[in-house]
Every structure is written in structure tokens, then in C-alpha cells.
């Protein structure tokens, strides 16, 4: 029998913004504990929110083997590593004042705009241990400005958005960024009939395209890239990888199954060559395919392989 232990702690501050004013502050601290056990090709999982007795949780996970959920134990290389990337980003003790100051400047610099939605701070801690000797731990934090913007003269519910995720907050830069949006919005554009390049968020179309690289779709032949593993399937200027480098903000260097990406990058496509597929360890073993380090799991669930694009917990980078 093999065992894994996962502990997560997430703290957050969230200011609700309405009509360019601070409306409320929400503080949340959540801890979760997970035990997974593997025996004879089966998995048992038990999880709990808040403080818990790990021995009791382990016993519950062992009992849950009776659910007979097939899942092989695929050991990762034994690694002992700890990273603490926490920075002094903002004054969290005076988070309302930080938010009010930013909103006051935005209101002054962009008087025709109304701002709504959230200003947030996250601090996360993750620890993964298995009985093979691996011990991985990570601490990180980030500051998120996620504002919807309405011009006072329009009937629209929302005209623009401004989103910034950073661990190096610069209030002046945030104001300058929004001022650029303001100036552009208030500059009439003369657009004639014709074809134009359109700039869109990758999530609009890329996530659907990346579905072709799920292991189960590939194995069933339901993907446009059938039999493409280790072959050049796209332009050699294109690389797509899960980013665990120092550039990734508040992202643990390991996934929820304890795998660590070599040099911080787990390639889906490297210079046009299909190197791996989106799969958890179960799917990778079932279909005998290499996998992108991208497993994610709820505190009381079996690991899944998910596609994450520019989310706080994981990044898929297209270069």
C-alpha cells in the first residue's frame, strides 16, 4: 500500500467595488487535508476542511478502497524541495485603505469611468508528502485587480475590463494602464469596411482547441492530431507548456499528484512537436502516453487532468 498526504491553506482578502467605491471587505482562511492510498490498482481518498486528525483521515481513505475506484500507483521521482516566494506586495493590515487610494486616483484620472467588481489578495500554502520520501512545499502570494468598467455615457452594463495579477504591485502603473484604456475609449475611430486583425483573450478559443490534446480523446482517435505524438504537427515556432517557472505568479512548482516539471516547464508542444498529452497518472498509464504535469484535485476527490489558462493556480503558456 502506498500513501500520499496533501495539506493546503488559502488566505484571501476581497474588497467588493461598486460605483468606484469600496462596498465591503471579505476575509477567508481555509485549510484542507487530503490522504490518498493506493493498493492493488485501486485508490481510496479522504479529505477534510479545517483541522483534522490525519490518522483518522488515513483510516477513512483506506476504508474508501472498498469503493473499488481503479487507479494505479505511479510513483514520482523522490524529491525533497521547499520554496517560499511570498513578497510584501501590499499592506494587508490596511487593505481597505490600499483599495480606496487606488479607486480615488482612478476616479480622478478617469472621471467618465465607473468601476465595479473586486480587488483581492491571495496567500497560499501547499504541502505534498508521500511514503516514498517525497516532501514538496510551496508558499506564494499575489495581488489581483479585477475591475469591470462602465463609461457613464453608455447604456451598457460593462464597456471594458481591467485585470492585473501581480506579486510586484505598482499603483502608478495600474493607474497608467487604466488611463490608457480611458484615452483609447474616448478617441473616436474611423473604421472602414474591410478585414482587420482582432485581439482576443486566449481563453476565448485556445481552451477549446487544447481539448484535442486530452489523453482520452487522443486514444479514441477523436482528435485532429491522431498519432501525432513525437511528431511535428504544428509550426516549429509554436511551443505550449505548463509554466512552473519563477515567472508564474503564486503557482506551486508541483502538481496535485506530486510531479515536478523539469526546468519548470512541462511541454505539450515544443517547437511544433507534440511531446505529451493532458492526462492524470491514471490516464497516462491506461493509454501509455507521456503527460503534461497538470493534475488537479479537490481535497476529497480523485486527481483530474485539467486545462488551465492564466489562472492563479496554473498557467498554460503559448509562445
PLM region spans:
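Active-site bordering "gate/hinge" segments
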Residues: 1-252, 270-273, 307
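Dual-mode signal for accessory low-complexity, basic/Gly-rich regions
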Residues: 230-306, 310, 314, 319
Amino acid at each position: 500500500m502506498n500513501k500520499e498526504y496533501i495539506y493546503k491553506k488559502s488566505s484571501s482578502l476581497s474588497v467588493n467595488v461598486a460605483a468606484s467605491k469600496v462596498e465591503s471587505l471579505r476575509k477567508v482562511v481555509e485549510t484542507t487535508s487530503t490522504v490518498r492510498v493506493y493498493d492493488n490498482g485501486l485508490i481510496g481518498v479522504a479529505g477534510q476542511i479545517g483541522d483534522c486528525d490525519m490518522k483518522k483521515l488515513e483510516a477513512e481513505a483506506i476504508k474508501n478502497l472498498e469503493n473499488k475506484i481503479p487507479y494505479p500507483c505511479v510513483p514520482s521521482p523522490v524529491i525533497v524541495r521547499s520554496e517560499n516566494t511570498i513578497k510584501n506586495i501590499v499592506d494587508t493590515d490596511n487593505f481597505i485603505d490600499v483599495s480606496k487610494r487606488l479607486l480615488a486616483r482612478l476616479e480622478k484620472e478617469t472621471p467618465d469611468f465607473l468601476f465595479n467588481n473586486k480587488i483581492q489578495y491571495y496567500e497560499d500554502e501547499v504541502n505534498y508528502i508521500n511514503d516514498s520520501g517525497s516532501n514538496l512545499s510551496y508558499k506564494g502570494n499575489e495581488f489581483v485587480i479585477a475591475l469591470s468598467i462602465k463609461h457613464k455615457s453608455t447604456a451598457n452594463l460593462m464597456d471594458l475590463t481591467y485585470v492585473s495579477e501581480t506579486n510586484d504591485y505598482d499603483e502608478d502603473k495600474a493607474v497608467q494602464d487604466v488611463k490608457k484604456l480611458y484615452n483609447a475609449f474616448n478617441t473616436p475611430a474611423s473604421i472602414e469596411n474591410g478585414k482587420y486583425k482582432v485581439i482576443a483573450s486566449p481563453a476565448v478559443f485556445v481552451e477549446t482547441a487544447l481539448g484535442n490534446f486530452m489523453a482520452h480523446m487522443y486514444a479514441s482517435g477523436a482528435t485532429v492530431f491522431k498519432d501525432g505524438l513525437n511528431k511535428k504537427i504544428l509550426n516549429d515556432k509554436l511551443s505550449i507548456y505548463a509554466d512552473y517557472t519563477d515567472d508564474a505568479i503564486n503557482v506551486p512548482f508541483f502538481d496535485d499528484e506530486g510531479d515536478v516539471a523539469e526546468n519548470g516547464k512541462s511541454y505539450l508542444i515544443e517547437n511544433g512537436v507534440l511531446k505529451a498529452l493532458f492526462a492524470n497518472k491514471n490516464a497516462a498509464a491506461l493509454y501509455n502516453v507521456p503527460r503534461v504535469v497538470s493534475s488537479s484535485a479537490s481535497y476529497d476527490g480523485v486527481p483530474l487532468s485539467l486545462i488551465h489558462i492564466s489562472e492563479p493556480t496554473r498557467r498554460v503558456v503559448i509562445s
